[in-house]
Amino acid sequence: MRLLGPLQVRRADGSLIHPREWRTGKTVDLLRLLATRSGEAVSVDEILEALWPNVDEHRGRGSLRNALGQLRKLLGQTAIERQRDGLVLRDAWVDTAALLKLADEARRHARHGRLALAVNVAREAEALHLGEFRAHDPDALWAVPIRENLEARFREMVLDAAEYAVELGWMRDALELGHRALDADTTSERAYRVLMSGFAGLGETERALRTYERCRAVLAEELGIDPSAQSRSLHLEILTSEHHEPPVAPFTGRDRELSTLLTWCAQRRATGTPGVVYLSGPDGSGRTRLVHEAARSLGAEVEVVE
């Protein structure tokens, strides 16, 4: 069940529910409300207050029964169960819950110094965030705190991951995450600093400096303030160097892959048999760094062929 961006709901058999199958917007919003609390009961009183706030209780309960019947018809009779005086959505994968779980996971990795894993988890979460959480009724007050919490958690995770990517020297990841963070908040100095560091780290000094000028202009126009001392310091650092390249960070988060690669190389060396190993992954995932770390451990040199 995807609630972020356009609604997508699949039945247990994998078939997609077509938008025309939803009878009313209230039916869809009932599902959205239950899905955001997947596995937890939502009281009938809370549902009535959220979806039928200006309707007397008798009519509201009748509308709820109709919407519930429609949902069970579409999803299956056991998909939504009564629990005391509430309703609970059972056995459903929901993107909002998955996103919050990934945000918690990324935070745990970072807390224990596993920055590479934190970045990878954030990139996984990016694929889930296809848009904001919205109710069918654009004025629905119940959806506001849910949307604000999801967006705040996502922005924080992406910004943190962007900064970790800079520390790791994963500049292309840093740029992609920084742009994503800036799309969510055009006044985020943290995002601008990530982009400045990313461009400078790739030797694109002019783009780094232009990013600072854009930051300065946006802050002045939108907030009436100047860039912070931290942003000004980074700007000066880039100005006074040919290109900004942070020190090489410790190699973390790839211990298992490095061990596997070294074991494979040792076996080839012991038997005297040549071989080829392929490392697959998206740009900026750390493949080149992994090869260099393996070569350093083996006392070998790496030749890059474009």
Label each PLM-derived region with a short phrase.
Residues 9, 31:
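Gly/Thr-rich phosphate-binding loop signature of adenosyl cofactor/nucleotide-binding cores
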Residues 65-72, 292:
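Short, hydrophobic-biased segments on the C-terminal half of alpha helices
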Residues 16-27, 33-40, 52-62, 66, ...:
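Intrinsically disordered, charged and Pro/Gly-enriched terminal/linker segments
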Residues 282-306:
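P-loop NTPase Walker A phosphate-binding motif
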Residues 279:
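Hydrophobic anchor at the beta1->P-loop junction of P-loop NTPases
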Residues 266-274:
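Phosphate-binding P-loop
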Residues 46-48:
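A short acidic, leucine-rich amphipathic alpha-helix
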